[in-house]
C-alpha cells in the first residue's frame, strides 16, 4: 500500500562565490584603478567624470521611490499608530541632536589642541574671494525658514520626481497614515505597494552592479583634476580631520555599538561594499537604497529604518559636523584671528542650526560651512579659498562618517523601540546567511 510521507530535506548549501565576484572587491579594484589612471594620465582621468556623475544620477533616480515605498508600507503595516510613530521620531531626533552636537564639540576641541592652521600667517586680503562666491550665494539661500518650507512639496508627485529626500519622506508618512485608516481598500493598496517595493529593491540590486564603473570614473576624475600633490600643501588639516573622524567612529560610535550589544567593526565589515561605494563616489546618498535593504535584512523593523535613515541624511551628519568646526577654526588660525571662548560658543551654536538639512551629496558640507561663516563675522568667509582645493579629498571622509553614523542610529533606535531582531542582527554581522526553511519531500512507500 502506498503512503505519502513528508520528509524534511536539509536545504542545499549554496556554492561559495568566487572572491572576485563580491561587489566590495570589484569596487575596491575600481578605486585603485581610478587612482592610478588619474595620477599617470590626468587628462584622461578628468574626462571620466561623467561615469561617476552618471552612476550617482542612476541611484538618485530611485532614492525617492524607495523611501516612499519603505516608509508608506512600514507605517501602514503597523496600523498607522501615530503615538508609536511620534515616539520613534522623537527618539531619533534626540539621538541626532546629541551626537551631532558631540561631533561639533569634538571638532572644536581637536582644532584647539592640534591648531592645524597656526603659523600660516595668511593675509585675508590676498585670498581669492571670487573662488568661493558661488558657495556663499548658495549659503545665503539656506535659511532655516526656507529649509522647513522646502520640506513641503509643490505637489504630491513632485516629491517623488525632484529628488528631495525630506519631501519624499514627508508625503510617505502622510500617505502611510492615510492608507492605514482606509480599511479594506487600504489593505489592498498596501499589498500592491509591497509587491512594487520588491521590484524596486530588485532594481537597486541591478544598479549596484554598475557601482565599480561609477567609483572608477569618480576617483579617476578626482585624482586627475586635483592631483595627489595637492594633498601635501594642507596635509596637517587633512590628517587631523581623518584621524578625528576615525576616533569618533571607533571610540564614540564604537562605545554606542558596544552598549547596544554588537561591534562597530562587525557593522563596518557588514557594510563594506556600501562604504567602498561611498568612498569611490564621495556621496553617502549613492549607497542609501542598499543601506535600507541591508538594515532590514539585519533585523531592523521596516518602519523604523524608513523613518530614521532618510531623516538622518539631513539631521545626523557626524562627519560634516566634525569638519565644520575643525575647518572654521583652521581658517581663523591661518589668517591670525584669535577666537575667544564666546566666539567659539557662538560658532558652535550657529553650526548646530546650519548643519541641519545638509544633504548627503558631494560638496554639501562646504556649502554648509560657508553658511556658518557668513553668520559668524569673526572668521572671514574668503578664508574658504584656503581649503577649496582640498575639500574634495575631505569629502570622502565626511561621507563615510555620516554613513556609519546613520547605520548605527537606525540599529540603536530600533533596539530602543523593540523593533530589532537581535538574532538576525548577530547572523548578519557574523556574515552568516539567513536560515532557510527545510522543504518537505513526498515519497511513496509500499
From Swiss-Prot:
The keyword Phosphoprotein does not apply. InterPro entries: C4_dicarb_transport, Na-dicarboxylate_symporter, Na-dicarboxylate_symporter_CS, Na:dicarbo_symporter_sf. It is found in: Cell inner membrane. One of its GO terms (biological process) is L-aspartate transmembrane transport. Keywords: Cell inner membrane, Cell membrane, Membrane, Symport, Transmembrane, Transmembrane helix, Transport. One of its GO terms (cellular component) is plasma membrane. It is a multi-pass membrane protein. Gene3D superfamilies: Sodium:dicarboxylate symporter. The chain crosses the membrane at residues 25-45, 58-78, 93-113, 159-179, 199-219, 236-256, 322-342, 370-390, 400-420. Pfam families: SDF. One of its GO terms (molecular function) is malate:proton symporter activity. Belongs to the dicarboxylate/amino acid:cation symporter (DAACS) (TC 2.A.23) family. Responsible for the transport of dicarboxylates such as succinate, fumarate, and malate from the periplasm across the membrane. This is C4-dicarboxylate transport protein. It comes from Sphingopyxis alaskensis (strain DSM 13593 / LMG 18877 / RB2256) (Sphingomonas alaskensis). The gene is dctA.
Amino acid at each position: 500500500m502506498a503512503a505519502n510521507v513528508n520528509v524534511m530535506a536539509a536545504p542545499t548549501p549554496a556554492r561559495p562565490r568566487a572572491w572576485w565576484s563580491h561587489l566590495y572587491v570589484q569596487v575596491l579594484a575600481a578605486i585603485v584603478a581610478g587612482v592610478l589612471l588619474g595620477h599617470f594620465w590626468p587628462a584622461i582621468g578628468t574626462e571620466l567624470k561623467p561615469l561617476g556623475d552618471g552612476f550617482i544620477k542612476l541611484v538618485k533616480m530611485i532614492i525617492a521611490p524607495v523611501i516612499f515605498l519603505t516608509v508608506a508600507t512600514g507605517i501602514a503595516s503597523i496600523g498607522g499608530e501615530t503615538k508609536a510613530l511620534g515616539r520613534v521620531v522623537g527618539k531619533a531626533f534626540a539621538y541626532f541632536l546629541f551626537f551631532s552636537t558631540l561631533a561639533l564639540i569634538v571638532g572644536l576641541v581637536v582644532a584647539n589642541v592640534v591648531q592645524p592652521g597656526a603659523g600660516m600667517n595668511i593675509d585675508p586680503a590676498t585670498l581669492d574671494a571670487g573662488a568661493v562666491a558661488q558657495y556663499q550665494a548658495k549659503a545665503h539661500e539656506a535659511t532655516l525658514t526656507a529649509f522647513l518650507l522646502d520640506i513641503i512639496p509643490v505637489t504630491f508627485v513632485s516629491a517623488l520626481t525632484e529628488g528631495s529626500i525630506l519631501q519624499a519622506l514627508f508625503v510617505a508618512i502622510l500617505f502611510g497614515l492615510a492608507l492605514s485608516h482606509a480599511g479594506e481598500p487600504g489593505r489592498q493598496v498596501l499589498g500592491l505597494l509591497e509587491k512594487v517595493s520588491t521590484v524596486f529593491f530588485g532594481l537597486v540590486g541591478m544598479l549596484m552592479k554598475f557601482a565599480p564603473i561609477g567609483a572608477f570614473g569618480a576617483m579617476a576624475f578626482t585624482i586627475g583634476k586635483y592631483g595627489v600633490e595637492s594633498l601635501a600643501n594642507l596635509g596637517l588639516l587633512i590628517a587631523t580631520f581623518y584621524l578625528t573622524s576615525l576616533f569618533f567612529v571607533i571610540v564614540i560610535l564604537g562605545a554606542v555599538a558596544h552598549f547596544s550589544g554588537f561591534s562597530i567593526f562587525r557593522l563596518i565589515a557588514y557594510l563594506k561594499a556600501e562604504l567602498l561605494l561611498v568612498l569611490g563616489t564621495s556621496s553617502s546618498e549613492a549607497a542609501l537604497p542598499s543601506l535600507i535593504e541591508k538594515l532590514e535584512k539585519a533585523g531592523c523593523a521596516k518602519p523604523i529604518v524608513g523613518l530614521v535613515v532618510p531623516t538622518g541624511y539631513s539631521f545626523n551628519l557626524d562627519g560634516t559636523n566634525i569638519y565644520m568646526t575643525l575647518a572654521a577654526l583652521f581658517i581663523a588660525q591661518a589668517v591670525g584671528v584669535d577666537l575667544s571662548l564666546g566666539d567659539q560658543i557662538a560658532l558652535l551654536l550657529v553650526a548646530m542650526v546650519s548643519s541641519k538639512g545638509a544633504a548627503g551629496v558631494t560638496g554639501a558640507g562646504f556649502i554648509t560651512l560657508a553658511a556658518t561663516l557668513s553668520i559668524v563675522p569673526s572668521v572671514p568667509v574668503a578664508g574658504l579659498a584656503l581649503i577649496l582645493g582640498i575639500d574634495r579629498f575631505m569629502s570622502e571622509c565626511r561621507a563615510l562618517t555620516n554613513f556609519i553614523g546613520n547605520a548605527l542610529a537606525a540599529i540603536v533606535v530600533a533596539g530602543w523601540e523593540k523593533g530589532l531582531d537581535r538574532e538576525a542582527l548577530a547572523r548578519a554581522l557574523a556574515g552568516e546567511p539567513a536560515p532557510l526553511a527545510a522543504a518537505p519531500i513526498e515519497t511513496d512507500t509500499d
